[in-house]
């Protein structure tokens, strides 16, 4: 496609695109107007140089314009990771989302099937009995009646089909791996976002600020997890009231024991679903600890708790009272109605 060639030529020199140029270039990519050779060369040029903030904002804008949107209550948040940490861990953000919803904060969770693990959010939720691929009206009902919905990425970003073959052929991370967490179909203004590389934390936080987010914690565990980990400290880049600050979370400071990486390693969706149900039924496991830690952080991001310790305590209470188990039961029932 001739109109795409100027953008390809510019990135080939190592120069960065402006926000507007990136938006237009990704409009072409997502419209299916670009050959596989052009798309692959373009994406790899960005990858090798490193994507600039304005390029990520422009790309996200192009994808957001095309996504199927969902109406969510005010104050809804997302708990999501970029994936790609190759940890094979349990479905931490999924369980944390259930706990957060049980504490009264609506969670519009956006996710997909496994990319680098054996069980992604979609995989474990399906194993738990949640129906995937609901239309926007069905998702809105889930939010209203269960306080939680799962927006299956492939049902909301049909334009991604144009670049799917290229991504498979490249077989490596590209900018598209980052766009999912930046393009929540419910337009949430608050996020707990995990990243597979610490170097991404501040740039993606600034991108979300540019895209209109109001409160964000972007986290990267010292063990490489795209979650707040319990094996050691976690670095946090927080967007709060228009300002960005950096701090570290140590699970021991909120009364949680350190875990080993093996403690957090999951398996297939059925195994992870059974482990999740066990936590909701009261099992005190390392999976429980990391889930209440992440849910506690989400409650702070949502403004429902003043501090992490309070958030962790509320998340734990949601398990003990059965409120979290009830959220999952309602989500299964409403999604299958």
From Swiss-Prot:
Pathway linked to the protein: Amino-acid biosynthesis; L-tryptophan biosynthesis; L-tryptophan from chorismate: step 2/5
Sorted alphabetically, the Gene Ontology BP terms of this entry are: L-tryptophan biosynthetic process
Keywords of the record: Amino-acid biosynthesis, Aromatic amino acid biosynthesis, Glycosyltransferase, Magnesium, Metal-binding, Transferase, Tryptophan biosynthesis
Q: Which residues bind Mg(2+) 2?
A: 226-227
Task: Tell me which Pfam families the record gives.
Answer: Glycos_trans_3N, Glycos_transf_3
Q: Could you name the Gene Ontology cellular component terms for this entry?
A: cytosol
> Domain of life, per the record?
Bacteria
Tell me which residues bind Mg(2+) 1: 93, 227
EC category name: transferase
Residue positions annotated to bind anthranilate 2 are 167
Which free-text remark accompanies the cofactor? Answer: Binds 2 magnesium ions per monomer.
What Gene3D superfamilies would the database entry show? Answer: Nucleoside phosphorylase/phosphoribosyltransferase catalytic domain, Transferase, Pyrimidine Nucleoside Phosphorylase, Chain C
The enzyme's E.C. designation: 2.4.2.18
The record lists the catalysed reaction(s) as: N-(5-phospho-beta-D-ribosyl)anthranilate + diphosphate = 5-phospho-alpha-D-ribose 1-diphosphate + anthranilate
Q: Which cofactor does it need?
A: Mg(2+)
Q: Where does anthranilate 1 bind?
A: 81, 112
Which amino acid positions bind 5-phospho-alpha-D-ribose 1-diphosphate, per UniProt?
81, 84-85, 89, 91-94, 109-117, 121
Molecular function (Gene Ontology), one example? magnesium ion binding
Task of the protein: Catalyzes the transfer of the phosphoribosyl group of 5-phosphorylribose-1-pyrophosphate (PRPP) to anthranilate to yield N-(5'-phosphoribosyl)-anthranilate (PRA).
Q: How does it assemble?
A: Homodimer.
What NCBIfam families does the record tag this protein with? Answer: trpD (TIGR01245)
**PANTHER family associated with the record:** ANTHRANILATE PHOSPHORIBOSYLTRANSFERASE
Q: Return the similarity comment.
A: Belongs to the anthranilate phosphoribosyltransferase family.
What is this protein identified as? Anthranilate phosphoribosyltransferase
UniProt source species:
Methylobacterium sp. (strain 4-46)
**Gene behind this chain?**
trpD
């Amino acid at each position: 496609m001739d109109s795409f060639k100027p953008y390809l030529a510019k990135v080939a020199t190592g120069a960065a695109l402006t926000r507007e140029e990136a938006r237009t270039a990704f409009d072409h990519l997502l419209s299916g107007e670009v050959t596989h050779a052009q798309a692959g060369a373009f994406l790899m040029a960005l990858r090798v140089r490193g994507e600039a903030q304005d390029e990520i904002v422009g790309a996200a804008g192009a994808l957001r314009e095309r996504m199927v949107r969902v109406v969510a209550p005010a104050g809804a948040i997302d708990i999501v990771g970029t994936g790609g940490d190759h940890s094979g861990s349990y479905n931490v953000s999924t369980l944390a989302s259930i706990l957060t919803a049980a504490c009264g904060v609506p969670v519009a969770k956006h996710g997909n099937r496994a990319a680098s693990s054996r069980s992604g959010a979609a995989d474990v939720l399906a194993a738990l009995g949640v129906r995937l691929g609901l239309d926007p009206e069905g998702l809105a009902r889930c939010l209203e009646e269960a306080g939680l919905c799962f927006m299956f990425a492939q049902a909301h970003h049909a334009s991604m089909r144009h670049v799917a073959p290229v991504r498979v052929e490249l077989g490596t991370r590209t900018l598209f791996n980052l766009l999912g967490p930046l393009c929540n179909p419910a337009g949430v203004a608050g996020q707990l976002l995990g990243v597979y590389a610490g170097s991404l934390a501040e740039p993606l936080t600034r991108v979300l600020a540019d895209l209109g987010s109001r409160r964000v914690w972007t986290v990267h565990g010292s063990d490489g997890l795209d979650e707040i980990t319990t094996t050691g400290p976690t670095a946090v880049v927080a967007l709060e009231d228009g300002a960005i600050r950096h701090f570290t979370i140590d699970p021991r400071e909120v009364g949680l024991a350190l875990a080993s990486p093996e403690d957090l390693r999951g398996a297939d969706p059925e195994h992870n679903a059974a482990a999740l149900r066990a936590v909701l039924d009261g099992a005190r496991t390392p999976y429980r600890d990391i889930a209440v830690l992440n849910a506690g952080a989400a409650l702070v991001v949502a403004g429902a708790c003043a501090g992490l310790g309070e958030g962790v305590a509320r998340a734990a209470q949601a398990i003990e009272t059965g409120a979290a188990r009830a959220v999952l039961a309602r989500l299964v029932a409403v999604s299958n109605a």
